[in-house]
Amino acid sequence: MLFAVRMDVDIPRDLDPEVRTDLVAREKAYCRDLQKAGTWVHIWRCVGQYANVSVFDVEDNEELHRVLWNLPLFPYLTIEVTPLAQHPSDLAADDAGA
């Protein structure tokens, strides 16, 4: 199942700088591991914002929940999830039916 996920980040300004550095490093490592595993398919930065739009490929809602819940930045995220389905005008849909 594919999901588009928007994540807006709001790390408190008064968070200890060492804690912030560690948190961001762990988030980056977790993100890369999920990308290598094929779970985190795409990630795009939202220009001018501390936010991203990502696409996840997971078995079900529960797996997506676990993936998001385990993000080190999870306590500081506002998350919007949209389930995705293939669009009939997608060129890949034409190729699959050929």
PLM region spans:
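Conserved, structured core segments of small domains
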Residues: 1-98
